[in-house]
A protein has these predicted regions:
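N-terminal lobe/hinge region of extracytoplasmic solute-binding protein
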Residues: 41-91, 122, 208-209
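Surface-exposed ligand-recognition segments of extracellular binding domains, strongest
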Residues: 22, 77-105, 118, 135-192
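Ser/Thr/Pro/Gly-rich low-complexity linker/stalk segments immediately outside membranes or between
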Residues: 28-40
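Structural transition elements
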Residues: 332-339
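A structural "hinge/loop" feature
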Residues: 44-61, 83-84, 110, 126, ...
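Extracytoplasmic/periplasmic ligand-capture domains
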Residues: 3-28, 101-130, 207, 212-325
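Gly/Pro-rich hinge or "lid" segments in bacterial periplasmic/extracellular proteins
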Residues: 149, 153-155, 159, 163-164, ...
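Short, solvent-exposed loop/turn elements at domain surfaces
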Residues: 46-53, 78-80, 176-179, 224-225, ...
């Protein structure tokens, strides 16, 4: 039998790099639920679960439970086979040929094929989609050109040769391409479902996915409920049967739910409580590759002047912010790429 603590650790791995600060709650008595149920307090209501249109960390966290791509990241952040059982790369590093696992299915039981990937990627790049994640597919041959209406859909470097084979051509060799494939912008979508209802990704009754879980219910701004997807290719390894995720943007409310035994974990506890929680062994600090930043409206005065923008950047005391405000092991950042 798997105890609650072990089960929680497995779920942390499933969430991947989106988790930075987690609070675990351990209670006894009638509030303990089945050990195969996970109760995670989501920090924001998703505006959509459409992989092409989502842009926030909470949306990505939910999608990680509902969708799966050609590859996924292991607990060390390295790509491993997922829907693709294998792949080959051309000598010049610009052409990838992916071979899908046999008998893949959507959560509604319909066959999932390489054509679903081709459709999804080209849909994301289609300017009429208005996809926030389109830029993530600019590594594809003519991906950026198509997104900017300078190339045709058929010019994009992704083609399903048959139901089980997907050929991808890149603009140039891209060492991190396999890691990109694990992100939501590269998830497949069901063409029939998408084209039947433009709001397909905003309701549990219409959302069709392919990941380890299915969306059973979605009470907007209230709670999301998940159930194990029996059609998932790796279903035998999914030990969690159900998940109940209350939604709250309030850090204090999320912490109250966890400490009161109404939830198992949350992300980003209030700064004032972090030391207490860490001393109690309830706070887990893990790595996250990401940035917090401010954006200037460069079309409005005075930020049309680059020197003004530089001046604002220079007077921001990043070390002070990290040490005394955000805390949690974060480091000051001076660029998007920290290495």
């Amino acid at each position: 039998m798997m105890d609650k603590r072990t089960l929680l650790k497995l779920v942390v791995l499933a969430f991947g790099a989106s988790i930075l600060l987690l609070v675990f709650g351990y209670t006894s008595g009638p509030k303990i639920v089945d050990e195969h149920t996970i109760r995670y307090v989501l920090e924001q209501e998703p505006s959509t679960l459409d992989p092409a249109k989502s842009s926030t960390s909470p949306e990505a966290t939910v999608q990680l439970q509902l969708f799966d791509g050609l590859v996924r990241l292991d607990d060390k952040g390295e790509p491993e086979a997922a829907l693709a059982k294998s792949w080959t790369v051309s000598d010049d590093g610009t052409r990838y040929t992916f071979h899908l696992r046999p008998n893949l299915k959507w959560s509604n039981g319909e066959p999932l094929t390489a054509h679903d990937f081709e459709y999804a990627w080209k849909r994301t790049l289609d300017p009429s989609t208005g996809a926030d994640s389109a830029y993530m597919l600019y590594v594809l041959k003519n991906g950026e050109a198509f997104n900017n209406e300078k190339a045709d859909r058929d010019d994009v470097g992704v083609e399903a040769i048959d139901d089980d084979t997907l050929v991808v051509t890149l603009e140039q060799p891209t060492a991190y391409f396999l890691k990109l494939l694990a992100s939501h912008g590269y998830y497949p979508v069901n063409k029939k479902v998408v084209e039947a209802n433009e709001n397909w990704a905003n309701d549990a009754e219409t959302l069709v996915s392919n990941g380890p879980f299915k969306l059973l219910g979605w009470q907007h701004n209230g709670e999301m409920n998940f159930v194990k997807n029996e059609h998932y290719w790796d279903a035998d390894e999914v030990v969690t049967k159900t998940m109940n995720w209350p939604i709250s943007e309030s850090q204090s409310t999320r912490l109250t739910l966890v400490e009161g035994g109404e939830a198992d974990m949350m992300v980003e506890p209030p700064v004032a409580d972090q030391q207490r929680l860490e001393e109690a062994g309830l706070l887990h600090i893990g790595p996250m590759l990401g940035n917090y930043y401010y954006l200037f409206n460069v079309k409005a005065e005075p930020f049309t002047n680059p020197d003004v923008r530089k001046a604002f950047s220079m007077v921001i005391d990043r070390k002070e912010i990290v040490k005394n405000i955000v805390k949690g092991g974060k480091e000051e950042a001076y660029a998007f790429v920290p290495y």
